Amino acid sequence: MAYYIVRAKPKPDRLNELKERLGRHAFVQMRPFGQALTRALNDARIQADGTAIWEEEDYCSPPLAEERAAVLDTYFEGITVERVQEGEGWKQIANLPRLGETNISEASY
């Protein structure tokens, strides 16, 4: 299994829907990635420029192929990944505000 830091620009017109679906655990049953994706998105952070950032575990090549097709491309654009050791991504972003607690229109672009 590999771990990645994921950076992506949330689509502002879809962010409330994403928050609502995460609140209903709508992605948890998606196999094989639903639980990990739900955990990661619930803990995602937001950078000052409005970029969402989180650590994700993944088995796919290319990384996040299934997650992008099923969920991520609906809610984010400009998705990039960088390989990290497990937990290192979360350490790097621990002090950033949570995506779910941020009004995306307040973030500076």
Where are these regions (language model features)?
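Conserved short beta-strand edge segments in small beta-sheet-based binding/regulatory domains
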Residues: 33, 77-91
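Short S/T/G/P-rich N-terminal loop/turn motif that feeds into the first structured element of a domain
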Residues: 1-52, 57-70, 90-109
